[in-house]
Curated annotation (Swiss-Prot):
Lipidation, S-palmitoyl cysteine type: C133, C143, C156
Post-translational modification (record): Phosphorylated at Tyr-14 by ABL1 in response to oxidative stress. Ubiquitinated. Undergo monoubiquitination and multi- and/or polyubiquitination. Monoubiquitination of N-terminal lysines promotes integration in a ternary complex with UBXN6 and VCP which promotes oligomeric CAV1 targeting to lysosomes for degradation. Ubiquitinated by ZNRF1; leading to degradation and modulation of the TLR4-mediated immune response.
Source organism superkingdom: Eukaryota
GO molecular function, one term: transmembrane transporter binding
UniProt-annotated stretches for the region Interacts with SPRY1, SPRY2, and SPRY4: 149-160
Protein name as it appears in the record: Caveolin-1
Modification sites for Phosphotyrosine: Y6, Y14, Y25
One cellular-component annotation, GO: Golgi apparatus
Region of interest: Interacts with SPRY1, SPRY2, SPRY3 and SPRY4: 131-142, 167-178
Length: 178
């Protein structure tokens, strides 16, 4: 560490030698990551979003894909004028498109804020209230389950075993009379 220049395995030039074990907070992380084949962790808040495919998990495939043909249809023998049909199609499609954009512009960010708060509260309650309550219940119920198990093995098992032996010798013969 005399201030000399060093070259690492990838050819990068640096002044202070890098520890082979990794940084001081995670000793052996460099060697362990290669040995354990750990994946690189990405922060969910800094990931890029896809502006083309906005439903990558196909949440709304069957619900909101409503086109003109799904709502308005004229059966054979009952047709309006072609111009009216084309104008209706255009009016429906453009109105749906721009009204959705208007609603998204007005209410999209407030609704995202509300749903973000809601799911944050839900996650918080699940992590800090629900799971600890269930774990404590399971710990507390364990002593009751032991007492119940002793009761069943002491009283119920012999009783039902005796009843089973009583009814095990019953034989039924059926005869068919003509």
């Amino acid at each position: 560490m005399s201030g000399g220049k060093y070259v690492d395995s990838e050819g990068h030039l640096y002044t202070v030698p890098i520890r082979e074990q990794g940084n001081i907070y995670k000793p052996n992380n460099k060697a362990m990551a290669e040995e354990m084949n750990e994946k690189q962790v990405y922060d969910a808040h800094t990931k890029e979003i896809d502006l083309v495919n906005r439903d990558p998990k196909h949440l709304n495939d069957d619900v909101v894909k409503i086109d003109f043909e799904d709502v308005i249809a004229e059966p054979e023998g009952t047709h309006s004028f072609d111009g009216i049909w084309k104008a209706s199609f255009t009016t429906f499609t453009v109105t749906k498109y721009w009204f959705y954009r208007l609603l998204s512009a007005l209410f999209g960010i407030p609704m995202a804020l509300i749903w973000g708060i809601y799911f944050a509260i839900l996650s918080f309650l699940h992590i800090w209230a629900v799971v600890p309550c269930i774990k404590s219940f399971l710990i507390e119920i364990q002593c009751i389950s032991r007492v119940y198990s002793i009761y069943v093995h002491t009283f119920c098992d012999p009783l039902f075993e005796a009843i089973g032996k009583i009814f095990s010798n019953i034989r039924i013969n059926t005869q068919k009379e003509i």
